[in-house]
Amino acid sequence: MTMVYSDNTSIITSAGGLMALLDEQERELQVHALLKIYEFIDQLWPEISDDVTKIEVMYEDHSFPERELAALVVSKVYYYLGEYDEALLFALSSGPKFLHDKNSDYKETLIFKCIDMFIHKSAELYKNPKADPLDERLSGVVEGIFQKCYAKNEWRHVLGIAIEAHRLDIIEYILNADKETDLKPYVLELAMTVVLDIEFRNRLLRLLLSSFLTETEPDYFSVGKCVVHLNDASVAAKLLMKLSSQNDDKSLLTAYQLAFDLEDSAPQEFLNSVMDLLPSPSVANSEEDANADSKKEDSSPCGYIIRILSGEQTVKYDREFLYAHNNTDMLILNRTKDSLEARNSVFHNAVTFANAFMNFGTSSDSFFRDNLSWLSKANNWSKFTATAALGVIHRGYYNQAMNILRPYLPEEDAPSSSTYSEGGAFYAMGLIHANHGRGVTEYLREQLKHTEDEIVQYGLLLGIGLTGMASRDETLYESVKTILFNDNAVAGSAAGISMGLIMLGTASSAAIDEMLQYAHETQHEKIIRGLGIGIALIVYGRQQEADGIIKELNNDLDPTLRYAGMFATALAYCGTSNSKIVRDVLHISVSDVNDDVRRAAVCALGFICFKDPNALISTVELLVDSYNPHVRYGSAIALGIACANSGSNAALDLLSRLVEDATDFVRQGAMIAQAMILTQHNDQLNSKVSGIRKHFEQVINEKHEDALAKLGATLAQGIIDAGGRNVTIALQTATGSLKLSAIVGLTVFLQYWYWFPLTHFMSLSFSPTALIGLDKNLNAPKFSFISNVRPKLFAYPPKSVQPTAKTVQKVETAVLSTTVKAQARAKRAEREKASKGSNDDEMKIDKKTTEEKEATPMEMDEEKSQDISINGNSKKEEPKSETLENFTRVVPAQLPYISFNLNGRYYPVRKFTGGVLMLIDRESDKAPDLIELNRDAVPASADTEPGEQEASPPEDFEYPFDDDD
C-alpha cells in the first residue's frame, strides 16, 4: 500500500490523541497517527518518549506497511533523548528515509555517528577477521557519502576515513582513480603521523610504494621515505642502481640526491645493507679496467653512492663549511673561563662543554692551546670530559681521528699513564664517528677485550654505542653484555646505554627481557638507570609495539625503572602528539610520588609534541607554576626540545618566569632551554636575544650565584653559539622524517643530571645549516642564489668587543686656604703691572677665544646633521634581498625566502629544504668553476676571518695532564 504524506500544517499541541490512535486496529488509522507524530516529532517527543516502545512494536511487526517510518520516529525520539547508538540503529532500519529528514542537526549527527561506527567496526574487523561482519546498511550509508565525495573530487575526505578505518581497498581505489600529484604525498604524511598500528602502516606504505613506482615519473624522494620506514634495503638498492645506470644527468643526480636523503634519515643498519647490496666499484667496472687505480674506480656512480651512504661525503662538506665559516666568539668563552674557578670540577667541566659545543665540527682547538695552565687543573673525570671534547670539536674527521687522539690512546705493552684520558679518548672516537662507525667499531671492540679498568671501559662502551648506533650487530651487543654482567657500577651504566644504542629502534623482545631482568637483579642504581635508558632506546619509534614494556616499566615498584618508562614513552611516541599518550604522561607528572619520575614525565612531553610546539606550550603553561621544582625544570626542558630553534616568544615568556626561579636547577634548565630556542637568532629576528645573552653572562659573573645556575648559563652559552654559530638543533631531517641521532642525543644528554660526561651527547643533535650545492661529479661549483629578505634579518650576531682600558685621572691635590690667599695676592700684583701695558693684545685674545667658542657648537651641529642624513640614507638604502654563494649559511627560518636564478647555469634537482642539494648543469659542455675544498688539512683559529686563515697546520700538542694518582 502506497502512503501519501500529508501536507496539512495544522498545529498539534498534544500527542495523547495520536498515541491513542496507534492502539486502533485499523492500519490506516495507525499510519495516519504515525505520519502526524512524525510531522510534529520535534515538539511532541517528550510525550512520545514515555510510550516509544509502542512504536518499536509496530516496527518489529513485519506486516506493518510503514515499518521504516516507525523506525525513523523511534530514531528521532532516541536522538532527542541523547541515546545516539539506539538512534543510529533505528535510523539504519529506516532505510534511506533518515537521509532525507528535514532536521539537518539530526541528519548530520547521525551521519557523523555512522562514520564513527564504520571506522570502529572496520578497524576491529581488520585486526580480527573473525569478528562480526560490517552491517550492510551501515556500509551502504557510508558508501553513499563516499560516492558524493567522488563526484566532487573530494578525495581527501574519503582518504581520511579510509585510513582510520584500515580500508586498504578504498585507499587503493582512490590512488588509482585520482591523478592529483599531491595526493600520494598526502597519504604518506597521514601514514607517518596518524597511523599508529605498525602492521597496517607497513601495508599502507607497501601500497604507496607500488603506486609511486607505477608512475611514469615517480616521486623518488617519497619512495625513499617509504623504503626507510619499511626498512627495505633491497628496494632502495635496486632504485639507486636503476637511476644511476640511466644515461641522463637528471636521473643520476636524482640517485645522488636520494642517497643523501637516505644517509640523513636511515639507521646505520639500513645504510650498511644498501651498501652491501650495491656492486662495488671494482665489480661495476669492466674487466679491462680492473687494474685501474682506486681513485678511478671510486668515480663510478656506484662508488659515489657508496661514499654518500657511508656519510663520508656529507661530513666532508659539513666540515668544510664549519671550518670556513667559523664565527665563534672566543671572547665570551674566555670571559666565562676567567669568571669561574678552574679548580671546581663543576665549573671546569662546564667550560669544557661550552668550548666543545661552540667549536663543534670546526676542528678549532685554539682555546685549549691558549689555556694550557687552565687545562692542567683538570683532574679525574674532568680529564675524561676534556679529552672527550676533542671528539665534539673534530666531529666527522674520520680519516684523522687516530692521529688526533693518538697522544691519549693506550700504547701496546705500555703501562697506562691516565685511565681518565684513555677513557675520554675512546669516548671521543665514538663522538667523531657517531652513527657512522663502520670502520672503527671493530677497533673499539678489540680494545674492550683487553682492558679491565672501569673508567677505560666506560669510555669504550660509550664509544661502541655511538659507532654502532642502530647497527643491530648481535656480536657487538654480546660483547657489551659481557661487561654488564661484571656488575661494576660505572662500566655497567655505560653498558646499559650502549646496548640500547646498538639495538636502537628494534623493539627486540629478547634484549628487553634480559636487560629488564638484570635491572631487577642488580643493586647498583647506576646500572639500573643505564639499562632503563637502554630499554627506552630500543623501543624508539615503535609506538603501539612498545605499549607492553612501557606499561610494565610504569607499574614497576622501582622509581628508577618508572623514570625509564617515561623516556620509553617519549621515544616510542616521539613526534606523534598522541593525545592519549599525552594524557597518560600528564597524569604521571602530577601523581607519581618520585620527583625524578615526575621530572622525566614532563620532559617526555617535549619529545612527544615537538612537531606541534603550540600544543606543547599550552600543555605546560600551568606546569611552569607547579609547586614542585622538578616539574618546573621538566617544563623548561620540554619547551626547549619542542621549540628548538623556533624563537617562539610564547615559550620564551614562560621561560622568563623560570630563569628567576628560587630553585637553582630550575634556573639552570630554563637557561638551557632559552639557548635551544634561540640558536641562530639575532636581535633582528627576536629582540630578546641580546637581553638573554647578557643574562647568561651576569649569572656567570655573579659571585654569590649558585653553582648549578652557573653551570646552566655556561652550557647555554655553548648551545646558543654552537658550531661557530653555524648549526641548529634539528629533530627532523630536511625531508620531514625523525632525525634519529638528534633525538637520541638529546635523550642521553638529559642524563647529565646524574653524570656530567653524558653532556657531550648534546652534540649529536647539532645539524649544520648551509646550502651545499654539488654537481654530478660531487664537486662544489661556484654559483649564486638569492635570499629575498633583508640581510640583517639572518646575519650572525655581532661579536663581543674587548673593553678599552680606562685612563687613570689624577686627583687634584688639596690646597690650604692660606696658600690660596697668597696666590690671590700675587695675581692681583701681576694684573696691576699688566694694566700699564697696551690693551690691544687683550682684545685680540678675547675676540679669538670668543670666536672659537661660538664656532665649535656650529661645527658640531653641522656634523650631527651630516650624521643624521648619512644614517637616514643608509636606512633607506638597506637592500631587501642579497645574493649568496654556494657553501653559505642558510638558517631554517630563511628557507622560504630562498630562490634560484631560473636562467642561471645551475638549478636544483628538487626544491631546497636544507642540506646537500644536487645541481643540474645547463652548460655541462663547459668546464665548471669549482670551489677549492681545503678542510682535510688545517684546523683554524676561531678568532681569524676565513680569508685570513693560515695554510700551515698548528703544531701538535698534548693536554698537560699529570698522571693519575
From Swiss-Prot:
| Alphabetically ordered keywords of this record | Phosphoprotein, Proteasome, Repeat
A Gene Ontology annotation in the biological process aspect, one of them, is: proteasome-mediated ubiquitin-dependent protein catabolic process
InterPro entries, per database record = 26S_Psome_Rpn2 (IPR016642), ARM-like (IPR011989), ARM-type_fold (IPR016024), Proteasome/cyclosome_rpt (IPR002015), PSMD1_RPN2_N (IPR048570), RPN2_C (IPR040623)
| Stretches with biased composition (Basic and acidic residues) | 827-856, 874-883
Q: Which GO terms describe its molecular function?
A: enzyme regulator activity
Swiss-Prot/TrEMBL PC repeat ranges: 385-418, 424-457, 459-493, 494-528, 530-563, 564-599, 600-632, 634-668, 669-699, 712-744
Residues with Phosphoserine modification: S952
Q: Where is the composition biased (Acidic residues)?
A: 945-965
Can you name a GO cellular component term?
nucleus
Q: Where is this region: Disordered?
A: 826-883, 934-965
Q: What does this protein do?
A: Acts as a regulatory subunit of the 26S proteasome which is involved in the ATP-dependent degradation of ubiquitinated proteins.
Q: According to its UniProt record, which protein family does this protein belong to?
A: Belongs to the proteasome subunit S1 family.
Q: Under what name is this protein listed?
A: 26S proteasome regulatory subunit rpn2
Upper classification of the source organism reads: Eukaryota, Fungi, Dikarya, Ascomycota, Taphrinomycotina
